[in-house]
Amino acid sequence: MNRLKDSPGGNRVVITVIGPDRVGIIAAVSAVLAEKGVNILDISQTIMQEFFVMVLVGDMATATVDLVTLKDLLAEKGEELKVRIDTQHEDIFNFMHRI
């Protein structure tokens, strides 16, 4: 089963995290998502020259908050972690990154 294909496109968000690597970034971001009912469909992370880089696709079908609220909550968490967290609807992300 491909969870990305099975999830309705209108409910997906793309979350990007970039900043200095440190312990607990994935745990902190995942905790916010779990608390607000956002299911993680896909996650990819790497370390590039001491910088943490993560791209996460989440399904908001069961979320208890709207996209704007989630974006604000994650941005606040990013400030706390000293990383940049951007949250976009998947359609916007795809439009901005098409070739």
PLM-predicted stretches and their roles:
Residues 1-99:
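A conserved regulatory-domain signal marking ACT and ACT-like small-molecule sensing domains
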